[in-house]
Design a protein with these regions (language model features):
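Active-site-adjacent substructure of cysteine-protease-like catalytic cores
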Residues: 77-105
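Active-site acidic/histidine clusters and adjacent loop/turn architecture
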Residues: 16-82
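Long, contiguous hydrophobic alpha-helical segments, chiefly transmembrane helices and signal peptides
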Residues: 26, 53, 90, 110-112
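A generic structural signal for short, non-catalytic loop/turn and secondary-structure boundary residues
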Residues: 16-19, 83, 103-105, 168
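N-terminal low-complexity, Pro/Thr/Ser-rich intrinsically disordered segments
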Residues: 1-9, 14-16
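Catalytic cores and adjacent binding grooves of peptidoglycan-active enzymes
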Residues: 94-101, 106-178
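A generic secondary-structure signal marking the coil-to-beta-strand transition
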Residues: 22-24, 86, 108
């Protein structure tokens, strides 16, 4: 992809060059149980894995509300994307509260149904801000991710790490590929 195609999700100084990123068209089952097509931007090395993972999620009929690139939101605002329950990958941004790049800035992380699967910090704060109802991980709503779920295993069996296994923060939406 080009810098122009990435829009506000990329800027000079980002740790990955646009030429190292690829746009991947993804079929997914929506919350309406119909097939939808979305787009992810990922690192070129991960394209075959990402295609396979999302084909498996599709066959599992795991519901994903929407899949859009970060540039669909003003200034590629991550909070707006998460509040919209948008599944996304590349976004040149840091780790909140840190001076380190997020794996999203390398195209090596995917957040899945982020409103339903919030990131919970040790302080008790969480993102996105409209996810309070989903802090209760005993819920069984379609699209939620839990330890041992087939959807989680599809990622982890492919070598991805799930933020739901972390202790601080616990990032239920987040999968990253080292």
């Amino acid at each position: 992809v080009t810098a122009a195609e990435l829009g506000a999700s990329w800027r000079p100084g980002c740790p990955v060059d646009p030429a190292q990123l690829r746009r991947v068209d993804i079929d997914h089952i929506g919350f309406d149980r119909a097939t939808h097509r979305g787009e992810l931007i990922v690192h070129e090395d991960l394209v075959p894995e990402v295609i396979t993972i999302f084909e498996r999620l599709y066959r599992l009929r795991f519901p994903i509300e929407k899949i859009r690139t970060a540039d669909h939101y003003p200034d590629a605002d991550d909070e707006q994307s998460m509040e919209d329950n948008n599944t996304s990958a590349f976004n040149c941004r840091g780790i909140p509260g840190s001076d380190h790049w997020s794996q999203h800035a390398y195209g090596r992380a995917i957040d899945v149904n982020p409103r339903l699967n919030p990131c919970v910090y040790a302080t008790g704060t969480f993102q996105p801000q409209n996810a309070a109802n989903y802090l209760d991980r005993g819920r069984t709503d379609p699209g939620l991710l839990h330890s041992g779920d087939p959807a989680v295993r599809i990622f982890t069996d492919s070598g991805w790490r799930w933020g739901g296994y972390w202790t601080a923060p616990i990032d239920y939406q987040h999968f990253e590929r080292p």
